[in-house]
Amino acid sequence: MQEILNIFKALSDETRLRILKLLGGGDLCVCDIFSALDMVQPKVSFHLSVLKEAGLIADRKEGRWVHYRIDDSDLLRRFLILTAFERISEDDMKEDKQRLSLFLETKKASDGNGSRTATIKKSKCCGR
């Protein structure tokens, strides 16, 4: 019972749904996500931990960086994520996707530093 409650709790927050929708496009590191959402890193990390605890996302470490992806190994969780995706319109995600795209372009052009985003200014990003 607690497992299903954790899943629904994780899916009941707009920010977490936005994170899942972004991860639907592929693996992202924390700096990618907080730049896309225009939020501070600790807040995004909290939401990522809730999603991970619910078994909705998985992570992998690459050096000192952590990359997140949707964990689709469980059929029920995958179904719930896809159901949530259907309820989120592209218009709802337009600004997040634009910020993510701009951040990824900037990060690529600045050899991973992403210095355009004030939150991570003067600190290295995930090195992609």
Model-found features: residue ranges?
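N-terminal leader segment of winged-helix/HTH proteins
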Residues: 1-11, 56, 82, 112
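N-terminal helix-turn-helix DNA-binding core of bacterial DNA-binding proteins
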Residues: 2-43, 49, 65-75
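A general structural signal for well-ordered secondary-structure junctions
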Residues: 14, 29, 57, 109-110
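C-terminal regulatory/oligomerization modules of transcriptional regulators
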Residues: 25, 53, 74-128
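Generic cytosolic/nucleocytoplasmic N-terminal low-complexity/intrinsically disordered segments
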Residues: 42, 60, 120-123
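Beta-hairpin "wing" of winged helix-turn-helix
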Residues: 53-62, 69
